[in-house]
């Protein structure tokens, strides 16, 4: 799918095939990923999706993303498996634990933005590896409003890279458990944790 529409925003992050375990049952082969859900939450054809999938990515998933993205020129398909994630949610859905993660083709993927994308006014860096988020931000030629998302896995395994990126963004999105892990303040209240995270350099939280 191609389009001459202006690029209002670039949405980048994970596109995955998930296995979800919750009180209602076990759900396999579910379309997941931060970029996929961020794209689908927006009005159709206002954002460009940037990401990678494997050759196991089902056509029904591709068609759904194609219907919502301005173009799929930046949705790369490589030989191999799509990023996979399995998670189990508490009965009240207040938290989850990761059962497994398989990065698949995303492990060797380097994003490459189009000229239009490099000059868009808004950039959403959805949850994915901080080194890939940084690579994409470095390609921007404009100075977009940057929204950054992450989750506990990357706080634990890529803390240094994540903190270097946080200071470059306009809005950093994080939940309570992630804030506790990032701030290292297990017994602190929300205000104290928020101050510690804002001290890392994001303009807002």
Identify the meaning behind each predicted range.
Residues 103-108, 150-157:
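Short gly/ser/thr-rich secondary-structure transition/capping motifs
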Residues 141-143, 154-205:
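Conserved phosphate/ATP/ADP-binding segment of small-molecule kinases
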Residues 5-8, 17-29, 44-124, 138-143:
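Conserved N-terminal subdomain of the carbohydrate kinase-like
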Residues 33-44, 137:
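Histidine-anchored nucleotide/phosphate-binding helix
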Residues 61-64, 132-139, 160-164:
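A short acidic, amphipathic alpha-helical/loop segment
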Residues 13-15:
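Active-site metal-binding loops of divalent metal-dependent hydrolases
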Residues 54-56, 127-132, 151-155:
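Short beta->alpha connector loops
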């Amino acid at each position: 799918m191609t389009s001459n529409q202006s690029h209002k925003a670039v949405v980048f992050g994970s596109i995955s095939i998930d296995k979800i375990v919750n009180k209602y049952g076990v759900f396999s082969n579910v379309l997941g990923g931060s970029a996929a859900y961020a794209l689908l939450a927006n009005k159709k054809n206002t954002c460009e999706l940037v990401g990678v999938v494997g050759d196991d990515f089902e056509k029904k998933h591709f068609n759904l993303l194609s219907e919502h993205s301005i173009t799929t020129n930046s949705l790369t398909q490589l030989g191999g498996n799509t990023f996979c994630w399995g998670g189990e949610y508490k009965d009240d859905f207040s938290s989850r634990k990761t059962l497994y993660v398989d990065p698949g083709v995303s492990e060797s993927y380097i994003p490459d933005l189009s000229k239009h994308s490099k000059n868009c006014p808004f950039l959403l860096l959805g949850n994915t590896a901080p080194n890939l988020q940084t690579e994409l931000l470095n390609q921007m030629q404009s100075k977009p409003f940057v929204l950054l998302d992450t989750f506990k896995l990357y706080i634990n395994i890529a803390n240094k890279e994540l903190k270097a990126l946080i200071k470059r963004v306009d809005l950093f999105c994080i939940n309570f458990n992630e804030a506790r892990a990032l701030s290292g303040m297990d017994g602190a209240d929300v205000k104290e944790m928020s101050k510690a995270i804002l001290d890392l350099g994001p303009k807002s939280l």
